[in-house]
Amino acid sequence: MEWIKQLGKLLLVLVLQVLLFNRIQIAGWCFPMVYILFLINLPANLPRWTEMLIGAFVGIIVDVWYSSIGVHMAACVALSFLRPILLHNLVQDVERVTNSVSRLTIGRIEYMKCAITLTFIHHLLVFALEAWSLQNWWLVLLQTLISSMMTLLVILGYDSLKR
């Protein structure tokens, strides 16, 4: 039954990304990628291979909508690979977290650190792979920072609504 709930969350996040957040582009610098909320909030007790497979699946779906060849998939797989490492470093008893990761299950500060780190890494990979050059690295970094801030506003705002 839990997997049906997770599938529903995934569909909701992807529909919102494609229909709403895909249309929000501020001056060509801000591209909120809120779909990573699903990957960040996956249960902490998932096997790593399952988490990475889910990340690849989510990334492929987003790549189809954005017409990007593997960019989002690579960034989502990297996020899915790094998330358990980050959780084990931030949360002392991460094995006890069987539900979705949120501020309620791991703590507010730990969740914010996790969300900020994973969002920045994901966005940096997306924009660096899209640029495919280090010639204008500062533009990639600026776009990463601005888009990460917008994405984090939505992610942390959503999480603050949970009770």
What do these predicted ranges mean?
Residues 1-163:
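Terminal, non-globular segments
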